[in-house]
């Protein structure tokens, strides 16, 4: 596909208007694939965050009174706009983020549209609750919008993660100030341009800028009714602390070191494909990536060479090329972090079975392209098995039986994703239930559709997204207790 032409400069989207940062600050957006300049973006200030919040609270006065049918119609309209501009948005995402166009065309953009449609359906199907407690009292339970939410989006799935946050917040009747990552803001800015005028002014606001500046202003802002964050556990902890200090809720989708478990009765070809899908999809920059591959000892000697061969055949290339299977890491900082873990693995006594280095020649030399990497001779106590690398790097750990692999899989501070590969459905269900994680796949990996709750155990987060239950996080409960009797309570004497 051909690259698209972007605006030379993007402002902040506040109260339905585009404006420069209050202090005029900007930053350059560059493609991680070739270092080319893409656009100039506004660096949001503290005053800009306050202005966006004020606009959102003003809009909330009327937005909260809209009916589910009205909001559902707008959500469906947004989904239609996304579909109509799929090729454009997909290419913007690939240019800005470095992920292959085949992923943005088939996963990121279409799934984002489906999230808006899903939550439109959820609110139309919601019927509320009323209970007759006894002959005297009727209890009505309502869920009301919580207010203005501060939402912070990561760089690994900028457009899709924005949909995960934006669709339910709008469905619930809330307003939002959304901050995409500085590393990949352009698809969200283009989205704001495309839906300009669809939502009432102030309902949806976009503030761009560095996490250390604009992101910190979001955390320090006093007027959000809730915070929602996807990103690292380290930053997520700060988000949780900021919310706790103000006694507001926070939804946190954080890091992972997920176990991808292969028993000897798995379908072998499917298993090899699944190991690649688990760690090479999106260049391994996936919070639930299958970065710990557990292989039963009876097939280990067959499995590892086959996986090495498969890894070495992966087509790494420029993200806008149709035949590219794996694109660029997000930036130079990230690829240096990945390479540092390769060195740590060597120091710990592990073996680099394939990859372990970046591309330094040809058309990929100017970008942050990593070779698919497999590390063997690993024990679960090594740093490369415990710490999130966030790249196309998997460790392979041998196990003997079911009890052993469950125990070792659970020996992690994280609990976000995981998978089990076997033809024995009873074994699959046992392992899926016993591994301490929020999402377990069986004979597949990295499927993240709407209507299936996604979120973590342990330090992998708080709350569940991509399911109607997230609406509970964006609303608050009101109980109306009605006395059906005209008689006094009898607690106090009457004349």
Give a label for each model feature.
Residues 36-126, 136:
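Glycine-rich loop-to-alpha-helix module at the N-terminal edge of alpha/beta enzyme cores
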Residues 1-33, 357:
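Hydrophobic face of amphipathic alpha-helices that form TPR/SEL1-like repeat modules
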Residues 128-270, 399:
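Rossmann-like NAD(P) dinucleotide-binding subdomain of oxidoreductase/dehydrogenase enzymes
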């Amino acid at each position: 596909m051909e690259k698209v032409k972007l605006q030379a400069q993007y402002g902040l989207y506040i109260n339905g208007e585009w404006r420069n940062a209050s202090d005029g600050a900007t930053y350059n957006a560059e493609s991680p694939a070739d270092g080319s300049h893409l656009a100039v973006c506004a660096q949001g200030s503290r005053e800009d965050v306050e202005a966006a919040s004020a606009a959102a609270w003003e809009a909330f006065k009327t937005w909260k009174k809209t009916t589910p049918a009205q909001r559902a119609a707008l959500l469906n309209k947004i989904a239609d706009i996304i579909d109509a501009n799929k090729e454009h948005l997909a290419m913007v995402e690939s240019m800005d983020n470095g992920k292959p166009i085949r992923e943005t065309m088939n996963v990121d953009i279409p799934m984002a549209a489906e999230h808006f449609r899903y939550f439109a359906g959820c609110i139309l199907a919601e019927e509320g609750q009323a209970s007759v407690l006894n002959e005297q009292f009727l209890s009505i339970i309502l869920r009301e919008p919580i207010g203005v939410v501060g939402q912070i989006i990561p760089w690994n799935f900028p457009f899709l993660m924005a949909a995960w946050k934006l669709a339910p917040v709008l469905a619930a009747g809330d307003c939002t100030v959304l901050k995409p990552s500085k590393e990949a803001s352009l698809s969200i800015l283009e989205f704001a341009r495309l839906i300009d005028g669809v939502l009432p002014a102030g309902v949806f606001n976009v503030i761009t800028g560095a996490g250390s500046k604009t992101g910190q202003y979001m955390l320090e802002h006093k007027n959000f009714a809730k915070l929602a964050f996807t990103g690292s556990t380290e930053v997520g902890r700060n988000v949780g602390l900021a919310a706790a200090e103000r006694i507001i809720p926070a939804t946190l989708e954080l890091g992972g070191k997920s176990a991808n478990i292969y028993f000897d009765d798995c379908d072998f070809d499917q298993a090899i494909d699944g190991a690649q899908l688990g760690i090479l999809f999106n260049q391994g920059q996936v919070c639930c990536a299958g970065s710990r591959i557990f292989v039963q000892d009876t097939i280990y000697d067959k499995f590892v060479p086959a996986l090495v061969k498969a890894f070495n055949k992966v087509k790494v290339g420029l993200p806008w090329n149709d035949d590219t299977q794996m694109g660029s890491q997000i930036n130079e900082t990230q690829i240096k972090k990945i390479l540092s873990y390769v060195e740590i693995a060597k120091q710990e006594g592990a073996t680099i079975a394939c990859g372990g280095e970046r591309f330094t020649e040809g058309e990929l030399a100017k970008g942050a392209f990593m070779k698919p990497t497999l590390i063997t001779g690993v024990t679960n106590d090594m740093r490369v098995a415990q710490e999130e690398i966030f790249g196309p790097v998997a460790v392979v750990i041998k196990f003997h039986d079911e009890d052993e692999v469950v125990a070792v899989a659970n020996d992690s501070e994280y609990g976000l994703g995981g998978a089990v590969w076997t033809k024995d459905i009873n074994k699959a269900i046992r392992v899926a239930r016993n591994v301490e994680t929020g999402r377990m796949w069986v004979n597949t990996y990295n499927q993240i559709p709407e209507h299936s709750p996604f979120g973590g155990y342990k330090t992998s987060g708080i709350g569940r997204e991509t399911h109607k239950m997230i609406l509970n996080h964006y609303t608050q409960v009101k109980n109306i207790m009605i006395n059906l009797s005209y008689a006094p309570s009898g607690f106090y004497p009457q004349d």
